[in-house]
Amino acid sequence: MATSVQTGKAKQLTLLGFFAITASMVMAVYEYPTFATSGFSLVFFLLLGGILWFIPVGLCAAEMATVDGWEEGGVFAWVSNTLGPRWGFAAISFGYLQIAIGFIPMLYFVLGALSYILKWPALNEDPITKTIAALIILWALALTQFGGTKYTARIAKVGFFAGILLPAFILIALAAIYLHSGAPVAIEMDSKTFFPDFSKVGTLVVFVAFILSYMGVEASATHVNEMSNPGRDYPLAMLLLMVAAICLSSVGGLSIAMVIPGNEINLSAGVMQTFTVLMSHVAPEIEWTVRVISALLLLGVLAEIASWIVGPSRGMYVTAQKNLLPAAFAKMNKNGVPVTLVISQLVITSIALIILTNTGGGNNMSFLIALALTVVIYLCAYFMLFIGYIVLVLKHPDLKRTFNIPGGKGVKLVVAIVGLLTSIMAFIVSFLPPDNIQGDSTDMYVELLVVSFLVVLALPFILYAVHDRKGKANTGVTLEPINSQNAPKGHFFLHPRARSPHYIVMNDKKH
């Protein structure tokens, strides 16, 4: 049976050090068009999600991650130890499954960029063309990862700087020049438009995109154990991350919102739309650079998708290690890639992609359903995280931990309940059709989302119920936790949701 090796970690991670290894999560360029559809109120949504959801998740996860014996294993360990192994298995499964669906909006963004580069609109508009192209890209990227992940983190680092950070900086700079020139602005930015119109429920649906942008912080919580002064530095690091996310996402989203009217924003290609308008206004003689920027964005998101293919499956591998999955899922190739888990995830992605792209028309509705489905699946894991934390506070107050949410039991419960209620609110509004989906499409939106969610929701519980867990998974594999001292180069440029939590050690070789 696979085993886990505990490695000593020097407690030398500072506030800025922790911020640096977590900061990659605040850049979400492919979500900017969705943010922009809410106009100036996107700032309100970012503040709401940051204060009422991101901070509670970060604080609750950090305390659970520092309980003696729970330092490794993440959500699986925390939920298993508070609610039981069935729920722990479900929680980590939802984290694995949401990645499978989360690939779809990212692939749509890639196709949007590629359609601009090749001047081939059908690639972003025709469902069949879109489906075939997305499947080819997905499986081609997967093939690059089956050979091992030795260079994945380095590729992600280059992709982050050249394909995400640089285009985002150019977008913001062009938008600033556009605004300074006195060009017409598509939105109003004042105290009235700061708040969304709460009388229109459809306007609140976009909140799910903002929640998605904050998801994944719990994956970095284990590094709290490496901090020299977690009680002081960790809450400050969370505040810094929230401020950085709000500032960058606000500027990025508003750069699109003030240039493209909300009802004209293409969620897959909105960034390229914006670059086209900005460049034609600021420097029409070099409008060809839009295709260069599109290529950078394309490479950035391709690198991101590639880096997400193996990491979550390695995280899920801990369940195969504990024989909560059939033995076939414990299979590793010679390069340390859990091939059955990876292929299973990509098969789910492929099936969902085919259904959503062709049933939803391959347009904004497909993008929105994929986005909402990703969020509601992941929220199921967060429900368990918050409930597990409440159980920890009420039933296990004496368990030793190195970080405590300051303020005592009452404050801890308030933080967890606020996070849980915000999760429930986001979950409910996810099933409401957005304002830009009208007529018969609203019924199709709800039906597709509900049916898809129920199918995915049932998978972990069915698998847990039918699998005989009495045997042992004889894998001959050792898991060595990754920390800030032994992490591979470029590891922390990956989004926390995409990082492998441990090395795979086989035949004395570390992968």
UniProtKB/Swiss-Prot annotation:
The keyword Metal-binding does not apply. It is found in: Cell inner membrane. It is a multi-pass membrane protein. Inactive at pH 6.5 or above. Disruption phenotype: Mutant shows a 10-fold decrease in resistance with glutamate. Changing E304A: At least 90% decrease in substrate transport. One of its GO terms (biological process) is amino acid transport. Induction: By acidic conditions. Expression is regulated by a complex system involving RpoS, cAMP, CRP, EvgAS, H-NS, GadE, GadW and GadX. The level of involvement for each regulator varies depending upon the growth phase and the medium. GO terms for molecular function: antiporter activity. The chain crosses the membrane at residues 14-36, 41-64, 86-112, 127-147, 152-180, 202-225, 230-259, 289-322, 338-359, 363-396, 410-430, 444-467. It catalyses: 4-aminobutanoate(in) + L-glutamate(out) = 4-aminobutanoate(out) + L-glutamate(in). It holds the Pfam family AA_permease_2. Shows pH-dependent activity. The Glu/GABA transport activity is robust at pH 4.5 and rapidly decreases with increasing pH, with no detectable activity at pH 6.5 or above. The Glu analog L-trans-pyrrolidine-2,4-dicarboxylic acid (L-PDC) blocks the uptake of glutamate by selective inhibition. GO terms for cellular component: plasma membrane. Monomer. Belongs to the amino acid-polyamine-organocation (APC) superfamily. Glutamate:GABA antiporter (GGA) (TC 2.A.3.7) family. Involved in glutaminase-dependent acid resistance. Exchanges extracellular glutamate (Glu) for intracellular gamma-aminobutyric acid (GABA) under acidic conditions. The protonation states of substrates are crucial for transport. Selectively transports Glu with no net charge and GABA with a positive charge. Also efficiently transports glutamine and, to a smaller extent, methionine and leucine. When the extracellular pH drops below 2.5, can import L-glutamine and export either glutamate or GABA. Contains a unique C-terminal C-plug that plays an important role in substrate transport. The C-plug forms a folded domain and completely blocks the path to the putative substrate-binding site. Under neutral or basic pH, the C-plug probably remains closed and prevents substrate transport. At acidic pH, the C-plug may be displaced, allowing influx of Glu and efflux of GABA. This is Glutamate/gamma-aminobutyrate antiporter. The gene is gadC.
